[in-house]
Amino acid sequence: MGLDSLFMNVNLPQIQAEYDRLRARLAKVGWISHGYVQDRGPGAGGPCYQWTRKVKGKTVSVALSEKQYEALKQAIENWREVQQTLQRMQELSREIIFGTLPNPPRRKRLGKKVLGLN
C-alpha cells in the first residue's frame, strides 16, 4: 500500500481539528514528572512513600511525605498523558506533511510503518 492509497482520504479540516484539540489538552496539563511512586505500606516509623526514577542510567529513589506522594502521583499521570498526546500529534503531523506536500522521486512507495502511522 503506497502513499497514494494511504492519503486518498486525508481530511485536512478533521486532522487539524483533532490536532487543535490535542494542543488544547496540553495547555491544561498540570505539573509533570517522570519516574514512578509507590506506597510501601507502614514501616517502623509510619507510612513509607517513595519516588524512583533513572538519572544518567542509575536508579535514584527519594523518600516522600504523603502529600508529596499524592502530588507526584498526579504529576506522573500527567507526564504519561503528555507523552501519549505528543505521540498522536506527531502522527497527525506526519500524516499532513506526507499527505499534502510534494514528495521527491522514490524507488519504493512509503508505507504506514515507515512513516510511523500504524
Q: For each of these PLM feature ranges, what is it?
A:
Residues M1-N118:
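A positively charged, amphipathic N-terminal helix/segment that binds anionic biomolecules
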